[in-house]
């Protein structure tokens, strides 16, 4: 009686190792693709969240706009290209509704606010005082990055206008156009309803 060995042959072992190696490479590739997709999804989600926060901040500001002149300006509302140190559009106005609980802070509830594009960043500028003293510096907040263009259009008297020349009145509506990397142009319309100028 000849006894046969019940182990694996060298060829069978090499074949099993080759299959295991191929499965391992496939698993690592799938894992890398999943991790890359997760990173891209997080980046896009963060970008969309920042865009939504920007438009929410603008909506909060524009919904509280008031027809008020600051001490050093003859206009109620200012908007133009390449103004306020902007690389494109800029807008400046007064708004009500800046919280001052029980009047404890040494300031008004009225705030002067501006938006401008500088170095591919959309900035919001505001002063601590209703009528800032000459030489006062605003608080500058970067509200959105990777912005290529910041455009404004104004609605009044039943039509849209590319420029606002009526310094003594507020427009009825405002169109904000942001050109973003990599999304392109995104437009948002705001209804301007002047509030109380207490």
Swiss-Prot record:
Q: Which InterPro entries match?
A: N_methyl_site, Pilin-like, T2SS_protein-GspJ, T2SS_protein_J
The record's subcellular location field reads: Cell inner membrane
Q: Which domain of life is it from?
A: Bacteria
Query: Coding gene?
Result: pulJ
- UniProt family annotation: Belongs to the GSP J family.
Note the topology in the membrane.
Single-pass membrane protein
Gene3D superfamilies with a match to the protein in the record: GSPII I/J protein-like (3.10.610.10), gspk-gspi-gspj complex like domains (2.10.70.20)
Q: Summarize subunit and interaction data from the UniProt record for this chain.
A: Type II secretion is composed of four main components: the outer membrane complex, the inner membrane complex, the cytoplasmic secretion ATPase and the periplasm-spanning pseudopilus. Interacts with core component PulG.
The Gene Ontology biological process annotation of the record reads: protein secretion by the type II secretion system
This protein's UniProt keywords: Cell inner membrane, Cell membrane, Membrane, Methylation, Protein transport, Transmembrane, Transmembrane helix, Transport
Modified residues annotated as N-methylphenylalanine in this record = 8
What is known about its processing and modification? Cleaved by prepilin peptidase. Methylated by prepilin peptidase at the amino group of the N-terminal phenylalanine once the leader sequence is cleaved by prepilin peptidase.
According to its UniProt entry, what is the function of this protein?
A: Component of the type II secretion system required for the energy-dependent secretion of extracellular factors such as proteases and toxins from the periplasm. Part of the pseudopilus tip complex that is critical for the recognition and binding of secretion substrates.
Would you name any one GO CC term?
Answer: type II protein secretion system complex
What transmembrane ranges does the database entry give? 8-28
What positions belong to the pro-peptide in this record?
1-7
Record protein name field: Type II secretion system protein J
């Amino acid at each position: 009686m000849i006894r046969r060995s019940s182990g694996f042959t060298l060829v069978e072992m090499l074949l099993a190792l080759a299959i295991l190696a191929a499965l391992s490479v496939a698993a690592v590739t799938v894992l890398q693709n999943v991790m890359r997709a997760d990173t891209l999804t997080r980046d896009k989600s963060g970008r969309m969240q920042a865009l939504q926060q920007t438009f929410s901040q603008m909506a909060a500001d524009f919904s509280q706009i008031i027809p008020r002149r600051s001490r050093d300006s003859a206009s109620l509302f200012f908007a133009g290209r390449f103004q306020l140190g902007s690389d494109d559009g800029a807008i400046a106005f007064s708004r009500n509704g800046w919280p001052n609980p029980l009047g404890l802070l040494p300031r008004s509830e009225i705030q002067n606010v501006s938006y401008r594009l500088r170095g591919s960043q959309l900035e919001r500028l505001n002063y601590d005082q209703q009528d800032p003293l000459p030489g006062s510096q605003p608080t500058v907040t970067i509200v959105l990055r990777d912005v290529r263009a910041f455009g404004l259009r104004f609605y009044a008297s039943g039509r849209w206008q590319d420029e606002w020349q009526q310094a003594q009145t507020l427009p009825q509506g405002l169109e904000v156009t942001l050109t973003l990397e990599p999304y392109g142009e995104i437009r948002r319309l705001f209804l301007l309803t002047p509030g109380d100028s207490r």
